[in-house]
Amino acid sequence: LMDVHAPQSEREILVNGWFGRGMPDLNQKNRHLARYLIQNSIWWIEYSRIDGIRQDTHPYADYDFMATWCKEVENEYPDFNIVGEAWYPRGTASAWWQRDSKMNESNSNLKTVMDFDLTFTCQKAFGDACSSREGFEAGLFKIYEVIAQDFLFPDPNNVLVFLDNHDLGRFMQKGESDLRRYKQAIAFLLTTRGIPQIYYGTEILMSGTKAEGDGIIRTDFPG
């Protein structure tokens, strides 16, 4: 949506097209449906007493509706947090989606976005940090280059930071025996800016790659 070169036809496909063959879209431009979805969300928050929601594939929904949805939910629950999955390999695009972004002509009202740029960088950087490679193209310097762009985010402290999740291969790969990389990465995750997310199983070194399938990286926690 932020691409100034994108034709209107592609924008409509992104927002109005089905996400998958078994995932039909709801017409969130319909005011009756929009009101139902907002009220239904508020009801479930009240009923379940949850503290936050991760909104999957946030950019694929109707922008104006999602901005209204975020605002009305926050009006009801000021301390509630909404995390939008805006999956972009560069932080510049993720920053566009955060609330009060100077790059966005309108306001998304989305408090927290996911920092996929830092995730992918960590997966590479900590591997380099345990090797003999040196220089400005290896190791932790890659991470420095990412967080040096934090001026793009309206609020870097409300960015979700993570090493892996249910859509990615686990940070601890199968057969890996070097715990130094793992410990260093966890230490960074828990001390850098933003809100740390730890995927279940990380604490017991669960492993698995995306190539093995989602069923492997989403294996039940043992016990």
Model-identified regions with their sequence ranges:
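Substrate-binding cleft of carbohydrate-active enzyme catalytic domains
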Residues: 1, 32, 45
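Conserved interdomain hinge at the start of the Helicase C-terminal
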Residues: 182-184
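Aromatic- and acidic-residue-enriched carbohydrate-binding clefts of CAZyme catalytic domains
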Residues: 1-28, 218
